Amino acid sequence: MIKIFFFRLYFFIIILFSYSFAMAYEEPSFKIVHQTDKYEIRHYQERLAVQSTYNNQNSSFRNLFNYISGANKDSQKIKMTTPVTQYDNNSEIVMQFYLPSKYTAKTAPIPSDPRVTLINIEEGYYAVIRYSGNARDKNFDKHSQILRTSLIEDKVQIIGPSIKAIYNGPFTLPIMRRNEAMFKVEWKKL
């Protein structure tokens, strides 16, 4: 009986910790302009990110993490934000970390590593489908295809590659994870 109690207590603490840990990061602000039972259309304002192109996911994450940990011209530490995004650019993968909203192109520290670049992401409309579980390609591809099919059925024009948005770290329980598949779209009210 005591073992069951401690197991439940442990499980509850892990869930609570996972949830509160995920909620601690700044996210880019957006406005939902349309919603269906499968997806939503969001309008994002212009935002600043750092990005790295890679063939090996771990090295790119490390490059970006080093930048926010102080590997920049000002040796300035920058708070982590969510989501971390990835998209396919021909045969390479681009990974991006959004910078906190207090930074502008003029005030953001310059990366020390030439593999890391600052980028302004233009404002625009994005179709988004949310899912839990792991962020592996198989799960992302499944949800990305559901989103693509729904957008085609609704005659919403896709104008960019599929984007994987990851909101939680690897220690978050899969059932508690927030992942998204996104497409930049040409938005006209349906």
What is each residue range found by the language model?
Residues 2-6, 17-190:
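A solvent-exposed interaction/effector surface
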Residues 11-17:
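Sec-dependent N-terminal signal peptides of Gram-positive bacterial secreted proteins and lipoproteins
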